[in-house]
Amino acid sequence: MTARNSASIPTSIRKTSENEVSGDETPAGVGNLSTKTASKTSLTFRQSSSDESTSSYSGNHHNINIQHHPNRPFRTNSSSFSPNDYSISESPSKSKKDGVHVSAVQLDNETDSEVESEVEELERELEAIEDSVYPEVRAAVNPTDDVNLPVNTWRTWVLTTIFVIVFAAVNQFFSLRYPALSISFIVAQLILFPLGKLLNLLPNWKIGYGRFSFYLNSSPFNVKEHAAITIAVSLTSSTAYATNILSAQTSFYKQNLSWGYKILIVLTSQMLGYGFAGLTRRWIVYPAAMIWPQTLVSTVLFRTLHGNSGNDIGVLKNNRISANGWTISRYRFFAYVMIGSFVFYWFPGFIFKGLSYFTVLCWIWPKNRVVNQLFGYNSGLGILPLTFDWQQVVYNSNPLASPWWVICNTFGSVVLIFWIVVPILYYKGVWFSNYLPMLSSSTFDHTGVSYNSSRVLNSDYSFNHTKYESYSPLYMPMSYSMSTALNFAAVTAIFTHCALYNGKDIWQRLWKESGKDECIHRKLMRNYKEAPQWWYATLFIVVFGLTIFTVRYYDTQCPVWALIVALLIFIVNFIPQGVLEGITNQHVGLNIITELIGGYILPGKPLANLMIKLYGFIPMRQGLEFSRDLKLAQYMKIPPRILFFVQLFATILGGITQVAVQEWMNYHIPGICTTSQSNGFTCPNGRSIYNASLIWGAIGPAKMFSKGKPYYPLIFFFLIGAVAPFITWGLRKRFPKSWIGKLNAPVLFTGPGNIPPATGINYSSWAIVGFIFNYVIRKRAIHWWRKYNYVLAAAMDSGVAVAGVVIFLCVSYPGGKITWWGNTVYTKTYDWKSVPYRSLGPNETFGYTNW
């Protein structure tokens, strides 16, 4: 079947398939990376005129309603119509009779044989047009492409350069501050639209000479340029993890580091995963089942800003397209919601912060320990409370872009593990946890205060066993212990799950890129030259060589063999993790497992533990973000070769910018990274990484997880994770239509992975929003859901992102604040003060007598 571009299709088309994959019935792509082709469609044809009347056509493939202009002559009971006079939108099918019958219209100047031929030609046109079998993708992505839209323009490169430098610099600057500010790439996506349109006013002058010349305004700013620049900014707007390690090394380990080391460690850790992402495209980017749900929000925002795409979703009523009674355009809907989101966020974000931490029961009983531990937000489990802060709702992911079955698995796991099991173990005093806060990501000593790792180290940061015995073992809060256990289970579960559910397709795609079936969006991308595999292989080899040079030439305590172990961690996890995230929006963090392995293979070497964590975790995380953007580029039909160079350029430029900004701050901000820094530049991320490196690298996991040690039982969760997918797979085979058949082991284990520091309040609000929109509305008002759901997600994110930046830069950072009950009530509770269930008296300790 031939893929078609928009120039050859005078209509916009939506199809509803009888055997499409539905998010309410089957977890998208859980069993197969391939897709199935829709067999029957239901269509409506309408003319753009405001004065129209209706006719209908039904047949074994299509049910078609025809709107025609009243000023055109026609005869009823004819056999066909002229397809060039009409555009297409969706309508529910009302007839499935065999054969073809048209109950309306023939133009007076056509013969029966001519219109008969036109019907056959139109049917061939319709059969040639495909769309995704996934309703989420159909609602967000056009199944067409305009190959004539330019991407490799001066606007793309100049705006990419400016936005990458600005976003990388600003986010790096404020990342060293507490509270921090992070400007999301969605802000760039919004600013780029009016700025690009403004550039359309430039004269079309010729700049340069010969082959090095270009025209200043040869074509209007288009959606593909917009998408390419946004993708570049998204890769670099968040702070590189390696810069936090640099903070730990310079400010806490007191190392003098060269510019060369700083640039190399940032770029190698950021780019090592890019090459592997390119080499694995056939598994985690190309398949239709790899939806990458979060990209759909960006896709809809692009479509909404650049035209009226999607406004034809619905049914024709009173000469207007109605989506379950709503006729407002996507653009106006986006504008209204974004403005409302911007205005409302000022309340939970500044005026009445209690709306963000809406733990009313804790406000009523501020000194009741049990109430605060069960229903609190800061150190409690967050049972029942709601939040009116959209940032809290989307803390885990955007619920409007998360499949309902994923939300069910995740929230069910939170309820079972953190709302039932954790309180039982906590109040029984397992591991003396009731002397610690119910929820915290910190480690503690036997007096209930944060563990002071410097008390068990020598001056060279090596472990001193005598000091350790005279001080205290490490104790983890119960929530932290269970989060660690779930992480262990998730790491092994994804391998078993991937083998059972996707193993056959992964093996087939090893030999044939396209697999059993191919998505229409992948087919349309064949209009462009692909970035070849050897480009990505070369990139991986070059960066791998630079990584070896970095750990060998500089003092990192990390031998090459240990580096290779770290790289193997990310390599073997990449495809299973990519499949999981591409389908579910969830991923398994490898930070704990890399620290665990690093602590066992290189005990007593905290700097080496940093390197193992950096190169075992970050290349996979960055590589999967690269893969996500490759999928977004596929949806937006951006030429792969141009995108390849744009992404590399942006990453290198952003990395150097972040290093330069951090270096400037080290020399120009007095007292940086100290707790007494007057402007809050205390380097909280660097301090956290430093403490983690001492705990996992210097003290080591052997003191916690080896046989005979307190947390040894958690190791068995590796086995539990490996076995659990067999159970869920068996249930799916036995009960394919029941909810029990939709249980997904990796999601059950990794879904609650943000606890701590997230709490139940983040998950309960997330689940409620997901239930309303991705279950109730999707089931009862499918046209509304398809037309507005992802627009709503983009508008809410956009309004909050812009409001957050304005509040921080214009009000909070200069020192503005409002002191009243609504901004202080939540801070006067035991929850906010992290009070444990059991308290110690002066000079009292708890815990084991021998460790």
Curated annotation (Swiss-Prot):
Residues 1-14, 74-92 have a biased composition (Polar residues). Induction: Expression is increased by cadmium ans repressed by cysteine. Glycans are attached at residues 32, 77, 109, 256, 452, 464, 691, 843. Keywords: Cell membrane, Coiled coil, Endoplasmic reticulum, Glycoprotein, Membrane, Peptide transport, Phosphoprotein, Protein transport, Transmembrane, Transmembrane helix, Transport. It holds the Pfam family OPT. The modification Phosphoserine is found at residue 93. Residues 33-68 have a biased composition (Low complexity). Residues 105-134 form a coiled coil. Its main location: endoplasmic reticulum. It is found in: Endoplasmic reticulum membrane; Cell membrane. The chain crosses the membrane at residues 156-176, 179-199, 259-279, 282-302, 333-353, 405-425, 480-500, 531-551, 560-580, 592-612, 642-662, 711-731, 757-777, 791-811. GO terms for molecular function: glutathione transmembrane transporter activity; oligopeptide transmembrane transporter activity. GO terms for cellular component: endoplasmic reticulum membrane; plasma membrane; plasma membrane of cell tip. Residues 1-116 are annotated as: Disordered. It is a multi-pass membrane protein. NCBIfam families: ISP4_OPT, OPT_sfam. High-affinity glutathione transporter which plays a role in scavenging glutathione from the extracellular environment for the maintenance of sulfur homeostasis. This is Glutathione transporter 1.
